């Protein structure tokens, strides 16, 4: 754990009490029973995980990034409107409308523009998402989302988009380690 941070440690009491650790406790997620497989999103039992990813380094201005957040938010919120095959899941999804709008390329963005700009974009982005959720939820006649943002250790998806994964720096140097899993039957 001291070497690379693995395995991660999560405290359920903190998860249930806080949306963001920067903000006061709100206890919105008091029913959380666990997490999705990568622990990006707290979930109730039977709840689906609805994540969407944004790329900080693809934007030259905060206003442009906020525009991307709008469409990322709308996509994720729309997914919460779709029924699944399980009534238990549908009931929870309708109650929570939980989404996870995330940022990738965080470390590289901080290197490029500085930590204070990153913090500003994160705070402005969070506030923007909250405003969208309030307005669109009211317009749609549905509940506001119990959670709207996440820290998502993206991995392969971000690399395919040319970004560093999650909060990690882009691998540098001649060699780097990357864990890859595939089936024993795969011809690779």
Protein language model regions, located:
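Generic beta-strand/beta-sheet core signal
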Residues: 10-13, 52-57, 149-154, 158-162, ...
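Short amphipathic alpha-helical segments
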Residues: 64-68, 121-128, 183-187
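Short, well-ordered loop/turn elements at secondary-structure boundaries
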Residues: 2-6, 44-47, 105, 142-145, ...
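Catalytic or ion-translocation cores adjacent to nucleophile or general acid/base/metal-coordination motifs
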Residues: 164-188
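Short, solvent-exposed secondary-structure capping/transition elements
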Residues: 60, 118-119, 169
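Internal maturation/activation junctions in enzymes
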Residues: 80-90, 105, 110-153
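Short glycine/threonine-rich loop-to-helix capping motif typified by GTGT followed
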Residues: 99, 161-164
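Function-dense linear segments that define catalytic or interfacial modules
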Residues: 4-113, 179-183
């Amino acid at each position: 754990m001291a070497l690379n941070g693995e395995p991660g440690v999560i405290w359920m009491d903190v998860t249930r009490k806080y949306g963001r650790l920067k903000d006061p406790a709100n206890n919105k997620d008091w029913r959380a029973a666990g997490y999705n497989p990568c622990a990006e999103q707290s979930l109730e039992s039977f709840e689906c995980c609805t994540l969407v990813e944004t790329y900080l380094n693809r934007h030259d201005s905060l206003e442009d990034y906020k525009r991307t957040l709008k469409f990322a938010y709308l996509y994720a919120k729309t997914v919460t409107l779709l029924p699944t095959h399980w009534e238990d899941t549908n009931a929870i999804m309708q109650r929570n409308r939980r989404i996870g709008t995330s940022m990738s390329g965080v470390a590289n963005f901080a290197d490029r523009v500085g930590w204070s700009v990153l913090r500003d974009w994160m705070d402005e982005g969070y506030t923007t998402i909250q405003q969208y959720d309030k307005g669109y939820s009211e317009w749609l006649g549905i509940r506001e989302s119990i959670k709207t943002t996440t820290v998502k250790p993206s991995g392969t998806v971000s690399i395919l988009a040319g970004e560093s994964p999650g909060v990690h720096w882009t691998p540098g140097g001649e060699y780097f380690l990357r864990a890859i899993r595939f089936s024993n039957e795969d011809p690779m």
